[in-house]
From Swiss-Prot:
This is S-adenosylmethionine uptake transporter. SUPFAM superfamilies: Multidrug resistance efflux transporter EmrE. It comes from the Bacteria. It is found in: Cell inner membrane. It comes from Rickettsia prowazekii (strain Madrid E). The gene is sam. It holds the Pfam family EamA.
Length: 294
């Protein structure tokens, strides 16, 4: 095995770790959300996340928390609150695999939001692919059938929130430290969640508290795994492997919740995955062209 292949496989392994952790997070969120309110799950998730980050704050010192855009951190925290509470609630309504496929559509929402917020010019091919991707969402969610549950749209609202976060990250927080982004967002989200969570409070069991701690910790681990992967291989090299999360989620959901993806989820995934792959590679090509022209 040559060095280039070893490096590539090393990067992919780190990326796969992020997928496994993300799938486990969804399974834990669904399990916790069946008894605890999504507001309470969000509070504990980000409360424990901020606690886990404290040793890093102490180690790197107050300079790591310096920020020139406090308002942006507040906005990110509000979007995280809205996104994670909607996502957790949606997971209690829909199968884990359905939620996973919805997450694949986030680049579609990001593309549309980028037009209005960043004033980006989008080539017509991307618009066509975006429409195709949304057709895939319709195929999966089946809004035209009697089996449609409107509450599943909470997953769509969450996806839009996460797309907004991507836009904010792209526009505002380039010069912010990763630690400040994580820590301030966790603090804001926990503070916003607590008053609402108190209205629906159910004291967690010891086991639930342990899961909530793991949930709060693993969010930072996902980011670490992703950054590690992207430091070794190009982000577009990992794109095809992103969709292995559907397989991982399906296996976990089957053994824990006895869920199995229905035909509409599979059909929707078959449409959405190629659409988002095209957008990812198109974005990469566009960025490369801009870089070469500078």
């Amino acid at each position: 095995m040559n060095d280039a292949l070893k490096t590539y496989l090393n990067g992919i392994c780190w990326f796969l770790l992020s997928l496994v952790t993300s799938s486990i997070n969804d399974v834990m969120s669904k399990y916790l959300g069946t008894r605890l309110h999504s507001f309470e799950v969000a509070f504990f998730r980000f409360f424990f996340s901020s606690i886990v980050l404290l040793p890093f704050v102490v180690y790197y010192g107050k300079n790591a928390l310096k920020t020139s855009r406090p308002f942006v951190h507040v906005l990110r925290g509000l979007l995280l609150f809205f996104g994670m509470t909607s996502w957790t609630y949606g997971l209690t309504i829909a199968p884990v695999t359905t939620a996973t496929v919805v997450s694949f559509a986030i680049p579609l929402f990001t593309l549309i939001l980028a037009v209005f917020i960043l004033n980006e010019n989008i080539i017509w091919q991307r618009w066509v692919v975006t429409v195709v991707g949304f057709i895939g969402l319709v195929v999966m969610l089946k809004p035209h059938t009697k089996d449609f549950n409107p509450e599943i749209l909470y997953l769509i609202l969450a996806a839009i929130s996460f797309a907004m976060l991507d836009i904010i990250n792209k526009k505002f927080v380039v010069k912010e430290s990763m630690l400040s982004m994580l820590f301030y967002s966790a603090i804001v989200t926990a503070m916003v969640s607590l008053p609402v969570a108190m209205q629906y409070w159910i004291t967690p069991s010891s086991f639930e508290l342990a899961l909530l701690f793991v949930l709060g910790s693993s969010g930072s681990f996902i980011l670490f795994f992703l950054l590690k992967a992207f430091s070794i291989v190009d982000a577009t090299a990992t794109a095809p492997y992103r969709y292995l999360e559907l397989v991982i989620s399906a296996i976990a959901a089957y053994f824990i919740f006895n869920e199995f993806p229905d035909k509409s989820t599979v059909h929707g995934a078959v449409i959405i995955i190629p659409a988002t792959l095209f957008i990812i590679y198109s974005e990469k090509k566009s960025m490369s062209s801009k870089h070469e022209s500078q």
